[in-house]
């Protein structure tokens, strides 16, 4: 009977959560990420992607592409984690076993769809997406096929906010023209080897004989990739153990002999590990740097922060504190950076100043001012960081609470004044109020309150307030 594996991927998840909880941002180009000189984009709304902005891009580059209309929002992973738990609670209730890949995507193989027609699969997926949208307000895309590979490619084709079902008799029409790098497991090394053989597309790989594949790529990995290229994918859908550590390391053909070479290698590994950390959705407390010298000695040094963070500048600066150089340890062959002590609880969300413990605050970036301009109104929203922001307890996009106006977020702070937009998921676009920076009625707030899911938090033993 026909097997159906489905892959669900939340659309622009981090940015969608921001637009959900801050109605002012809906329909506007949102960039989620750090605003320091080395900040990177953790998520970009589809409005921002139209300008070429994307995840893992340096923030300054993304802001330049989007222009003045870009809204830069500090990540709130505590919000994204809660939204993810609620989404996958719905998915698991409908599908049973779910194989979570990250905070915003996963595989499922519903028993109810064994032997189903493509039309029935599409209907099932649409009903799932509709329930997720109704309950959480978040958009999602679903791909379906005979295995994980086809399902994941299908969800990409379904974006944004759609369903893409690939019948068995149509899967080669989808697979064959795609670049071979689209296959699971084809990295730079394997890709280069295939390119040297004249294999550029998945169809090219599928057309090889088994003997050619075994000789070129090996009997294990090679045959596995060959089967995927031919649409054969019997990997089971099963729960994954949660990662305890996220790392990336690189071995260099030539020994690293200078401080500059090692610094570049640390940045390369830190950036790669950080991309995976953002996808995971948690913050890290411990940073480790691993070195393997030319004589095969291995040295690993670690530092544990007092809180978990995903702020790249903080993590990178910590890695540099741990670095050792050829003048100290001799020629270096391998450099790796890892993040561990992974936590969903994020103190730096409530207290943004924590991320200044490791790094010296950079000079104000005069290009940081970003705005939101409504297409239907002359009213604008300025999210800004003037020169005296370092002296203020208030940071742009920080969650706050006022006893009269409720939950809101900081749009700008400076010159003794803080401007706050009061709104949550369940409100319409909120009004902006200005207060003295030392107003005793204005206090930091739990970002979870912006979701306004008090009943759900109570039912699931979680908290959505400051207590």
From Swiss-Prot:
EC class, as a word, reads: transferase
Which PROSITE patterns does its entry note?
UMUC
Question: For the region Disordered, what residue ranges are annotated?
Answer: 364-383, 429-449
Q: Which residues bind Mg(2+)?
A: 9, 104
- Catalytic positions are 105
Q: Which CDD domains match?
A: PolY_Pol_IV_kappa
Q: Which InterPro entries match?
A: DNA/RNA_pol_sf, DNA_pol_Y-fam_lit_finger_sf, DNA_pol_Y-fam_little_finger, DNA_polymerase-Y, DNApol_IV, IMS_HHH_1, Rev_trsase/Diguanyl_cyclase, UmuC
* Any one GO BP annotation for this protein: DNA-templated DNA replication
Q: What is its EC number?
A: 2.7.7.7
Asked whether the UniProt record includes Nucleotide-binding among its keywords, one would answer: no
Its catalytic activity?
A: DNA(n) + a 2'-deoxyribonucleoside 5'-triphosphate = DNA(n+1) + diphosphate
The note on cofactor binding and number reads: Binds 2 magnesium ions per subunit.
This protein's major location comes to cytoplasm
Pfam families under this entry? Answer: IMS (PF00817), IMS_C (PF11799), IMS_HHH_1 (PF21999)
GO function terms (MF aspect): damaged DNA binding; DNA-directed DNA polymerase activity; magnesium ion binding
Q: Which family does it belong to?
A: Belongs to the DNA polymerase type-Y family.
Known HAMAP family for this protein? DNApol_IV
Write the protein's name: DNA polymerase IV
Q: Which gene encodes it?
A: dinB
């Amino acid at each position: 009977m026909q097997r159906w594996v489905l892959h669900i991927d939340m659309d622009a998840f981090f940015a969608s959560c921001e637009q959900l909880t801050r109605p002012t941002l809906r329909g506007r180009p949102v960039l989620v990420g750090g605003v320091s000189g080395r900040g990177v984009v953790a998520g970009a709304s589809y409005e921002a992607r139209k300008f070429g902005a994307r995840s893992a891009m340096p923030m300054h580059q993304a802001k330049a592409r989007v222009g003045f209309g870009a809204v830069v929002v500090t990540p709130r992973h505590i919000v994204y984690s809660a939204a993810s738990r609620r989404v996958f609670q719905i998915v698991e209730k409908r599908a049973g076993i779910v194989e979570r890949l990250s905070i915003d995507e996963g595989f499922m193989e519903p028993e109810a769809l064994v032997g189903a027609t493509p039309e029935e699969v599409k209907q099932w997926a649409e009903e799932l997406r509709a329930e997720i949208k109704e309950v959480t307000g978040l958009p999602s895309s679903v791909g379906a096929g005979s295995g994980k590979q086809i399902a994941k490619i299908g969800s990409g084709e379904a974006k944004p906010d759609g369903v893409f079902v690939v019948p068995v008799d149509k899967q080669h029409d989808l697979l064959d023209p795609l670049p071979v790098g689209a296959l699971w497991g084809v990295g730079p090394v394997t890709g280069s080897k295939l390119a040297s053989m004249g294999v550029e597309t998945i169809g090219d790989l599928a057309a090889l004989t088994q003997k050619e594949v075994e000789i070129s790529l090996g009997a294990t990995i090679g045959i596995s990739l060959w089967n995927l290229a031919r649409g054969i994918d019997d990997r089971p859908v099963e729960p994954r153990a949660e990662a305890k550590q996220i790392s990336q390391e690189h071995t260099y053909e030539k020994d690293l002999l200078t401080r500059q070479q090692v610094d570049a290698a640390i940045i390369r590994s830190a950036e790669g590990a950080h991309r995976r950390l953002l996808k995971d959705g948690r913050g890290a407390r411990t940073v480790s740097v691993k070195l393997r010298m030319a004589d095969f000695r291995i040295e690993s040094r670690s530092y544990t922060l007092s809180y978990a963070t995903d702020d790249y500048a903080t993590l990178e600066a910590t890695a540099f504190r741990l670095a050792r150089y050829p003048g100290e340890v001799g020629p270096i062959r391998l450099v790796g950076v890892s993040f561990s002590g992974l936590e969903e609880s994020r103190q730096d969300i409530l207290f943004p100043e924590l991320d200044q413990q490791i790094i010296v605050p950079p000079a104000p970036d005069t290009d940081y001012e970003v705005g939101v301009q409504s297409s239907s109104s002359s009213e604008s929203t300025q999210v800004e960081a003037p020169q005296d922001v370092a002296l203020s307890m208030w940071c742009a996009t920080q969650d706050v609470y006022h006893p009269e106006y409720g939950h809101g977020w900081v749009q700008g702070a400076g010159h003794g004044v803080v401007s706050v937009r009061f709104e949550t998921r369940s409100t319409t676009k909120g009004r902006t109020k200005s207060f003295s920076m030392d107003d005793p009625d204005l206090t930091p707030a739990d970002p979870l309150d912006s979701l306004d899911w008090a009943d759900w938090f109570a039912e699931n033993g979680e908290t959505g307030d400051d207590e």
